[in-house]
Amino acid sequence: MRVYKTYIQQLSFDGIAYKKGEVADLQKRFRIVCSSFPFKRNPEAKDLPSRDWAGEDGRDIYIPEKIPMKNYEIEAVFVYKGTEGTISSDISDFVDFLYGRNENAVGGRLAVYDEYVGMGRKDVHVLSVDNDVYECSDADPDAIAEFKVKFAVEDPVTEIIPEYVSLSGVNAVRDLRFNI
């Protein structure tokens, strides 16, 4: 059975160029997998400028060659599996990473790619993290947590293309590429 991974890369943008951090394999770095990252393949169009004249049929509307798309919000579901001794620090490290508050952070702007969905977006940022974080069972030595994170996708159209590299026969993502 194939395990589909989610990759996140911290970004910063100075108005001219992007600075990129390392690509984080969530499973390897934080012991977290994503069970749902519902990117929109076809986002909603922005409202176009128009005038509605009372004495005329229809409206005057400006229709550009490419209709611009709206940003949108999504709620992703993450699952953690570790031990009771590490659950708090692992999830805190993950949340700090998402907010760009970790050590050596590049920024809170993110590029995200989900292998299961087969797509990703850039200029993603966190809006909130669910406070109902985890559930531990006394009978199970593993700590399992499910929690939700709300993201804003500010660039709803730029495709992310993962750049894979083979390390000892195992594919890993080296960079999340996109055109600007």
Give the ranges of each region predicted by the language model.
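Extracellular/virion structural assembly segments
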Residues: M1-I180
